[in-house]
Amino acid sequence: MVMLDLPYPPSTNRYYRHVGFRTLISREGRTFRTNVCALLAGGGPRKPPVGGRIALCMDAFPPDNRRRDLDNLQKSVLDALQHAGVYEDDSQVDLLLTRRRQVVPAGRLSVEVLDLPLQRCPLCGSDMTNVGMN
C-alpha cells in the first residue's frame, strides 16, 4: 500500500493540448507532473514500482465550489503517477475509486495505491473477498 498527498490536478481538458494532429501535454500538465515527481522523490526510499494488478482510491479536495467532473481529473493523476514510477502502466489499474470531499484552500488530492485482490472496500469497509472472482 502506498499513500500519497498531491496537489489538486488540472482537468484532462487542461492537461493536454492539441497541435495539428498531435496531442501534447500542456505546460500546466507538465508542471503538475514535475511537482508529483518532486514530491515523491522527496519521500525517501520507496518500494519499486508496483507490477501487479492495483486499485487506486482518490479523495479529491477541490480548491473552490465550482462544478467539476471527477472523471476529468483521473487521467492526469494516472499519467503523473505512472511517470513518477508509482506503477508501470495505467493498464494495471483494475479498480478506480474517486470521491469528492470538502473544499480546501488550493485544493489537494489524497491517493491510496493498493495491491489487488482487496479484502475490504477502502471507502466503506465492506467485504470484497468475492468481488471479481469467477
Positions of predicted regions on the chain:
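Acidic, proline/glycine-enriched N-terminal capping motif
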Residues: 1-134
